[in-house]
């Protein structure tokens, strides 16, 4: 499981941030192109990217896919109330499910919040009534379906 909230913070300077911004624009951008754009040696870019990977700032390089264009009609946000002693256990089980895109323990009215992507309403129903129902410790859920997208981004680098 990815531990985000309590991870050790990595010091980023302006060169690191510039590299990260460019890679977020185009993850396939070559080190030589990044080097040219930010006016530092290619060896510096290569060393910085390797350090950012090693320190966990860059988790992986992947395509950012539009789920709707790829045949997934439903993006849903599910708030979960769990038995207090089983919150972590519930999260560990939910993390194993391929439909789950984002998952975390939260503050506020619920214990756990997640984003799931499925092909249609029937698949969402099966996910909730069959897969989630098997997980011990879930007391209740509240599901909201995304009806339109105004912005779909990723972690910003300040």
Swiss-Prot record:
GO: which molecular function terms? sequence-specific DNA binding
Q: A Gene Ontology biological process annotation?
A: response to amino acid
Entry's Gene Ontology cellular component terms: cytosol
Highest rank taxon of the organism: Archaea
Q: Name one Pfam family in it.
A: AsnC_trans_reg
Q: Which PANTHER family match?
A: LEUCINE-RESPONSIVE REGULATORY PROTEIN, TRANSCRIPTIONAL REGULATOR AZLB
Could you tell me what this protein is called?
A: Uncharacterized HTH-type transcriptional regulator PYRAB01370
HTH asnC-type domain: from which residue to which, for each copy? 12-73
UniProt cross-references to CDD domains, sorted A to Z: HTH_ARSR (cd00090)
DNA-binding region(s) from the entry = 31-50
SMART domains listed in its UniProt record? HTH_ASNC (SM00344)
Source species: Pyrococcus abyssi (strain GE5 / Orsay)
Q: Which UniProt keywords apply?
A: DNA-binding, Transcription, Transcription regulation
